[in-house]
Amino acid sequence: IEDNLYDRLASRYTKALARSMSNAKQVKAVEPLIQGLPTTDNFDSGDGVSLFNTSHPTVAGTFQNTLTTQADLNETSLEQSLIDIGQMTDERGLRIAARGVKMIIPSELQFTAERLMKSQGRTGTADNDINAIVSMGMVPQGYRVNNYLTDTDAFYILTDIPNGMKMFNRAPLTTAMEGDFDTGNVRYKARERYSFGVSDPRGIFGVEGT
């Protein structure tokens, strides 16, 4: 430090520490999506069942925010997902006219999603039909790739139901440094507190793929 031998390294390592903190937050953010899938079932919503379930209990019965039969992303599965979203009900069993807003996918599905969401005609068929998903504006905000999703064939649709997925930032990121009396080294640390969860599972629809 005295001869500026490690000045550049110190700057590089503090940036690496910030990058590590950011990466950790992204990994934690997608855990509910990955762990809440039907066969994984390691993340439950407040009603006691997995985040993505065909039988979320209500006062009047149940509602679902996943396909009855899991399927890979294609025209049929996307259309059925949007139909199921539109059939969501509230606690009393009344239709709430929910709509899909944005699709979240892993990087492995970005080319499939581009064809499904941008083609004017139907994909994978010789029929001269329009792409109903595009022409009806069924997913107005399109799709976004999340590179931290580890299930390569799962896809998710955010709905227009408020208070769905939640993040609480309990303590903002802070950094500190101090010198070590014995060695003369300089130590750096970073700390923040946050949590991720769900208030209303109607806010997201998830499909596991096959």
Question: At which residue positions do the language-model features occur?
Answer:
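Long, contiguous amphipathic alpha-helices that act as assembly "spine/axial" helices in icosahedral shell
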Residues: 1-41, 103, 188-190
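Charge-rich, acidic-biased intrinsically disordered regions
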Residues: 35-57
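Sequence/fold signature of self-assembling virion shell proteins
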Residues: 49-90, 97-102, 108-210
